[in-house]
A protein has these predicted regions:
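N-terminal hydrophobic or amphipathic helices and topogenic motifs
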Residues: 1-15, 19, 26, 193, ...
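Central regulatory/effector-binding core of bacterial HTH transcription factors
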Residues: 2-64, 132-133
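Paired acidic/hydrophobic, glycine-rich loop segments that form the ligand-binding mouth/hinge
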Residues: 7, 55-59, 79, 148-153
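A late-sequence structural motif
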Residues: 16, 167-209
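Hydrophobic hinge/microswitch elements
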Residues: 41-45, 50-53, 109-167
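Beta-alpha-beta core module
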Residues: 65-71, 75-76, 90, 137-185
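Flexible hinge/capping segments at coil-to-helix
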Residues: 67-103
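Secondary-structure junction motif
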Residues: 102-123, 188-196, 203-214
């Protein structure tokens, strides 16, 4: 038995977390474990991990010395445009094109919102962000209805999204790495320990090129 409280960012809600948790619960020793789920932005999740309300968090990287961060899946950043759009014929779109069209962005408080701003500074892009959204579903919906274009990770939301074009970023490979994090010096129930170790083995199975991806990404980590 045991109880595990986890928090995770919105892009992991559609498939990643439900799928991983179900596989964990299907193991004989875990069948009586109870999960509580909570969705939010990375900083809010980290705060609840720190107070002990959550055992484990899943989100972006934060510079926190009292927490352990373990890299899990990595998603390439892409530009999405509406079906009928001047860029629609281009397979790859330069990042600078974000300067020339209205942009649908992330809420500033979210990890992805902060990361996007960092990337804009790094690559000297100055987009006109007309609206900030809490999650990828909202971004895709607004792009589909021709309110603007967007920079976002290639999540499973995009696999089933119609009415939009997905473009690689020309000449750049930028990734959003998802991390699992927990408090370093805190007692954890055996079920929580098993779940952390299970997720680490899942990462190894999912890896493919994740190791290389992490290296590309980790150069970009900044202290927000």
């Amino acid at each position: 038995g045991g109880k595990i409280d986890i928090g995770y960012i919105f892009p992991l809600a559609g498939h990643y977390i439900p799928h991983k948790v179900r596989k964990f619960l299907n193991q004989e020793e875990n069948k009586n474990v109870v999960f509580n789920f909570w969705q939010n932005h990375t900083p809010a999740i980290a705060e609840k991990v720190r107070t002990g309300e959550l055992d484990v968090g899943f989100g972006g990287y934060l510079k926190m010395d009292d927490m352990e961060f373990f890299p899990l899946s990595a998603q390439e950043l892409v530009i999405i445009t509406p079906k009928e759009h001047p860029l629609s014929e281009m397979q790859e779109v330069p990042l600078v094109e974000l300067d020339y069209y209205p942009v649908i962005g992330y809420e500033s408080a979210s990890w992805m919102g902060t990361y996007a701003k960092y990337l804009y500074r790094k690559y000297q892009v100055n987009p006109n962000t007309i609206v900030e959204c809490p999650d990828e579903y909202s971004i895709v919906s607004l792009v589909r209805e021709n309110f603007g274009i967007a920079l976002m990770p290639q999540t499973d939301i995009l696999l089933n999204a119609d009415g939009i074009n997905i473009h690689k970023i020309m000449g750049l490979e930028i990734y959003r790495q998802v991390f699992m994090f927990w408090m370093k010096d805190r007692y954890r129930l055996p079920a929580v320990e098993r779940f952390i170790e299970y997720m680490k083995t899942q990462q190894a199975e999912d890896a493919n090129d994740t190791e290389n991806v992490s290296k590309i990404y980790l150069k970009d980590i900044v202290n927000f």
